[in-house]
C-alpha cells in the first residue's frame, strides 16, 4: 500500500516564507509609529480641550460685562487679566506676572478632568504633563482698551512621555523648553488666548 504525502513541498515552504517576510517588512514600520501617533493625538486632544475651555472663560467674561477680574466656570473661580479676558490662574490677574504655579492653575482649573500634571522642577513620575512658564516669550498683544502690552508670559505644558526623566529624581532633564529635542506639548498665551500643540521630532 502506497501512502500519499500531504503537506508543503520545500519550494512551497520557501515561497510562503518569502511572502511572509515581504508582508512583515511593509507592516512593521507602520506598527512602530503607532506609539508616536498616539502621543501626537493625545497632545492634540489636550490642546483642543484647553482651547475650548479658554474660549468658555472668555465667553463668560464677555457675558459678565468685560470688567471682572474673575469668572465662575463650573463652580471654580478663574482669574483673568481685564485687558484681555483670558484665564491667568485662580488669583493672578496679570499676563506679564505668570508663574509656573499660575500656569498650572490655568491648566487644572479650566479643563474638566485635567490630565495629571506637575511643575517641571518636581517629580514627574506617574504624571502626564509638566508645567512651565517662559517669561516674556508670549510676545505682545493689544488689550481691549487699545494699549499694547509687551513681554507676555507663555505657559508650556510638556507631555512627559516625550521627555527624558531622571530615574532617581523623576525630574525632566534637561529642563524642558520650546526647543527640547523630541518634546511634545501644548503652549498657552494668556494675552491672546492662543493654544497650540507642538512637536520637536
Question: Positions of the model-derived regions?
Answer:
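Membrane-proximal N-terminal amphipathic helix
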Residues: 38-66
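Charge-dense, E/K-rich amphipathic alpha-helical interfaces
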Residues: 68, 72-76
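N-terminal single-pass transmembrane signal-anchor helix
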Residues: 2-42, 46-49
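Intrinsically disordered, low-complexity regions enriched in Pro/Ser/Thr/Gly and acidic residues
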Residues: 76-201
Amino acid at each position: 500500500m502506497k501512502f500519499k504525502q500531504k503537506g508543503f513541498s520545500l519550494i512551497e515552504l520557501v515561497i510562503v516564507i518569502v511572502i511572509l517576510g515581504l508582508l512583515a517588512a511593509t507592516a512593521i514600520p507602520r506598527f512602530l509609529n503607532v506609539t508616536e501617533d498616539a502621543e501626537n493625538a493625545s497632545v492634540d486632544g489636550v490642546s483642543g480641550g484647553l482651547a475650548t475651555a479658554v474660549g468658555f472663560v472668555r465667553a463668560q467674561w464677555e457675558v459678565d460685562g468685560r470688567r471682572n477680574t474673575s469668572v465662575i466656570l463650573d463652580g471654580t473661580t478663574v482669574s483673568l487679566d481685564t485687558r484681555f479676558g483670558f484665564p491667568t490662574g485662580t488669583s493672578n490677574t496679570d499676563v506679564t506676572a505668570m508663574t509656573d504655579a499660575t500656569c498650572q492653575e490655568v491648566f487644572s482649573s479650566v479643563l474638566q478632568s485635567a490630565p495629571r500634571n506637575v511643575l517641571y522642577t518636581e517629580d514627574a513620575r506617574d504624571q502626564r504633563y509638566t508645567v512651565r512658564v517662559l517669561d516674556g516669550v508670549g510676545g505682545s498683544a493689544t488689550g481691549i482698551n487699545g494699549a499694547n502690552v509687551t513681554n507676555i508670559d507663555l505657559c508650556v505644558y510638556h507631555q512627559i512621555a516625550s521627555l527624558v526623566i531622571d530615574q532617581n529624581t523623576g525630574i525632566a532633564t534637561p529642563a524642558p523648553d520650546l526647543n527640547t529635542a523630541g518634546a511634545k506639548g501644548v503652549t498657552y498665551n494668556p494675552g491672546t488666548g492662543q493654544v497650540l500643540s507642538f512637536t520637536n521630532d
